[in-house]
């Protein structure tokens, strides 16, 4: 499917120079005083892992990879692979851990994830937008901290460090965004 350079978004997988590239950073749209508008795109090759910056004219069209998306349940780790089970047909597949990169700590047992396939090969795993995690370490509560909008560092059960409001304590569960690893709210 062809898309305009202006329509490129973070996470899009493009077919460029006969390779698959994932857009790794929000594209910058620039309108210089002289010359035509262009879009600066940072992307990563899915095969080699190399990063590249490309400049496309706003009038350019690029090929967006047609991906098939299926729901899978995470079962367990097996060496350097994740073992996932299709939620409809109960078939199990092994997917390399490196597909998730820095989001791997958010993966919990029995979590439902979306696996994106290109030509029947798993390319990407999409986690739920938020997860509930427990605070393992943080500074003690300071009296009167509910009135301030300041944050303190906290280490969660999965080892991730996030900034949380001053009033939260060790043992409390919080909601965290998986895309940028930020605090959302106290879990209900």
From Swiss-Prot:
Annotated compartments: Cytoplasm
Main location: cytoplasm
Pathway in which the depicted protein is active: Protein biosynthesis; polypeptide chain elongation
Keyword Nucleus: no
Molecular-function GO terms, alphabetical: translation elongation factor activity
CDD domains membership: S1_EF-P_repeat_1
The keyword DNA damage appears for this protein: no
GO terms for biological process, alphabetical: peptide biosynthetic process
Transmembrane stretches, start-end: none
InterPro entries documented for this protein: Elong-fact-P_C, NA-bd_OB-fold, Rib_uL2_dom2, Transl_elong_fac_P/YeiP, Transl_elong_KOW-like, Transl_elong_P/YeiP_cen, Transl_elong_P/YeiP_CS, Transl_elongation_fac_P
An example Gene Ontology CC term for this record: cytoplasm
Keywords: Cytoplasm, Elongation factor, Protein biosynthesis
Pfam families documented for this protein: EFP, EFP_N, Elong-fact-P_C
PANTHER family: ELONGATION FACTOR P, TRANSLATION ELONGATION FACTOR KOW-LIKE DOMAIN-CONTAINING PROTEIN
Family: Belongs to the elongation factor P family.
Function: Involved in peptide bond synthesis. Stimulates efficient translation and peptide-bond synthesis on native or reconstituted 70S ribosomes in vitro. Probably functions indirectly by altering the affinity of the ribosome for aminoacyl-tRNA, thus increasing their reactivity as acceptors for peptidyl transferase.
Protein name as annotated: Elongation factor P
Species in which this protein is naturally found: Rickettsia felis (strain ATCC VR-1525 / URRWXCal2) (Rickettsia azadi)
